């Protein structure tokens, strides 16, 4: 069993994670964890991770005015919850935004600039997604 938490308000989301855990769901992910309507704080992310969920951080447009601030917030949250429960992704590809490969590369570079090691980046961008998908 697996589950994805996306686009659900926080109280219902945590309730679904608890119920998923109780029902034996093995793989869960909270997508866009810091974005509305979920907008989790670090304590809530830690609770979700303890329930077995991965926490996803989505590197959207690196050219937006708030990109640096957003990346700073992501980095602070990841340092607290840990790379072992973190997944990095992008949802770029819309017209007017960078290509997904370019935007994701910029996101990874921004995390390196904020002190994350290559080992951390590999874990969050490759190994953890593979675990979530049951490939590892």
Role assignments for model-derived ranges:
Residues 3, 55, 91, 121, ...:
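Divalent metal-coordination and catalytic microenvironments
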Residues 52-64:
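His/Asp/Glu-enriched short active-site or ligand-binding loop at hydrolase and phosphoryl-transfer sites
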Residues 1-29, 37-53, 68-88, 102-114:
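Histidine/acidic residue-rich metal-binding segments in metalloenzymes
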Residues 7-11, 34-36, 59-61, 92-94:
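Active-site-proximal loop/turn and secondary-structure-junction residues that shape catalytic pockets
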Residues 58, 83-100:
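Short acidic/histidine-rich active-site segments
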Residues 31-36, 122-124:
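A generic structural motif
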Residues 103-136:
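Mid-to-C-terminal alpha-helical segments outside catalytic/metal-binding sites
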Residues 64-67, 96:
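Catalytic alpha/beta core domains of metabolic enzymes, predominantly
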């Amino acid at each position: 069993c697996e589950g994805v938490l996306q686009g659900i308000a926080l109280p219902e989301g945590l309730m679904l994670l608890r119920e998923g855990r109780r029902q034996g769901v093995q793989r869960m992910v909270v997508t866009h964890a810091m974005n509305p309507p979920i907008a989790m704080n670090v304590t809530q992310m830690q609770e979700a991770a303890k329930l077995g969920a991965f926490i996803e951080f989505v590197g959207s447009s690196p050219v937006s005015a708030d990109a640096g601030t957003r990346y700073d917030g992501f980095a602070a949250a990841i340092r607290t919850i840990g790379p072992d429960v973190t997944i990095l992704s992008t949802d770029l590809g819309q017209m007017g935004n960078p290509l997904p490969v370019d935007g994701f590369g910029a996101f990874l570079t921004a995390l390196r600039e904020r002190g994350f090691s290559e080992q951390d980046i590999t874990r969050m961008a490759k190994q953890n997604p593979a675990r979530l998908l049951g490939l590892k």
